[in-house]
A protein has these predicted regions:
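Domain-level signal for Mg2+-assisted phosphodiester chemistry and nucleotide/NA-binding surfaces
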Residues: 1-110, 156, 163-165
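Nuclease catalytic cores that cleave nucleic-acid phosphodiester bonds
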Residues: 85-207
Length: 207
């Protein structure tokens, strides 16, 4: 285990899922405040496990997503938006993991192997970094077995879910395997002011 004083948290972010959250906030002229969201995760774990809030620290954050090559992103007018999005992650010491996106013959964007990379990297780092907790921001059923494996290693697998769809897209198979869920939608219903703590207004920002 990690130090008795510090409880180490590994944070692993499904990039497509996270971008959908950010896109959903656009209608409110807001975006995720990465620093404050990380602080909220630390606070939530401390409350759930009755720990000193100052002892729960996200020691590593990793982000996984497919990305267009620079030329393709520029052609699709995505280059600046994507780089500004990445800047926010980098400013908060989030490690970026990318594979190139390719278009299928029918024009559908396709990314291969990101989910496998996410799972392998999460499991490997959970063991080698000796995390006390692993938090996943995702909703994909593909990570059901990852959550189960983490629990077999006596590492709580925590899910943060947040969606702007009419129905919760979080896979039931995944929810059945996690140790506990930080359900932002439910928390916002109970305390609407939370939105001001974990997001920020876009209009007043330069970047």
């Amino acid at each position: 285990m990690a130090s008795a004083d510090i409880k180490s948290i590994g944070l692993f972010i499904d990039g497509n899922y996270f971008k959908l959250i950010d896109n959903g906030l656009k209608a409110e002229a807001r975006r995720v405040n990465v620093k404050n969201l990380i602080a909220f995760i630390q606070q939530s774990i401390a409350e759930k496990y009755e720990l000193d809030p100052g002892s729960c620290i996200v020691t590593e954050s990793h982000f996984f997503r497919g990305r267009y090559k620079a030329y393709d992103a520029k052609k699709l007018n995505l280059l600046l938006e994507d780089r500004k999005f990445e800047d926010r992650l980098i400013e908060n010491d989030v490690v970026l993991h990318y594979k190139h996106v390719y278009d299928l013959p029918d024009g559908t964007p396709h990314e291969k192997g990101i989910d496998v990379w996410f799972a392998l990297e999460t499991l490997e780092l959970a063991m080698y970094r000796d995390f006390d907790f692993v938090v996943m921001i995702t909703g994909d059923a593909d990570y059901e077995m990852l959550a189960r494996k983490l629990k077999s290693l006596k590492i709580p697998a925590i899910l943060l879910s947040w969606h702007y769809d009419n129905q919760d897209p979080t896979a039931k198979a995944l929810k059945d395997e996690i140790s506990f869920q930080i359900n932002i939608n439910s928390l916002l219903k109970a305390d609407p002011s939370l939105i001001n703590k974990i997001t920020e207004a876009v209009s007043v920002l330069k970047g």
